[in-house]
Each structure stands twice: as structure tokens, then as C-alpha cells.
Amino acid sequence: MKIEHLALNVPDALNMARWYVEHLGLKVKRRTVEAPFVHFLADDSGTVMLELYQNPDAPALDFPAIQPPALHLALLSRDLPADVRRLVQAGA
């Protein structure tokens, strides 16, 4: 078995997907432009995806209140200090 995707219910799926594409280099594999605004974003391999969707009727996670060890997305970086600076400047 392989992991195909991880799904997150977020308050603004469209803008979050745009941010991940622009700043993390993820690629949009599939999306819907009407509610629940589902976006499947793939890494360079194209096999692991992050699904962002917006369902106000379902319980959403309080992301700022979640401690990083409980829920996080780990990324590889060739230049971690530079990427941290760049992503923080972009609003991460």
C-alpha cells in the first residue's frame, strides 16, 4: 500500500491551495470551483497529494492551537535557512 493523499478541511481552500502552489511548488492535479472547493495538490513525484477542501458544516481543525508534533506536513529542503526565511516572509 501507498499513501495517496491526506485531506484537510480548511477555512479558505482556494487561497490556501494558491499559496501551496506558489510557495511550495505543489501542482494542482484536480480541483472543483464550487463548494466544497476541493483541491488535490501533488508533490514532484505526482503520487503523494494533499487534499484541501472547505466544508463549513463539518468540524474544522483549529490549526493555530494544534502543536506541531500532533499534526504537521514535513517537507524536504536543499537550503533550509533560506526556505524558512522565504516561507515566513510569504506568511507561513
What residue ranges belong to the model's regions?
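Short glycine-enriched loop/turn motifs at secondary-structure junctions
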Residues: M1-K2, A65-A70
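Acidic-residue sensor for enzyme active/binding pockets
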Residues: E4, E51
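Short aromatic/hydrophobic contact patches that present stacked aromatics
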Residues: H5-A7, F40, H72-A74
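Core segments of cupin and vicinal oxygen chelate
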Residues: L8-M49
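Vicinal oxygen chelate
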Residues: P11-N15, P68-A92
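A short, acidic/glycine-rich surface segment
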Residues: F37, D57-F63
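Short, charged/polar surface micro-motifs in flexible loops or helix N-caps
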Residues: S45-M49, P56-P59, L80-P81
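Structural motif
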Residues: T47-L50, A70-H72
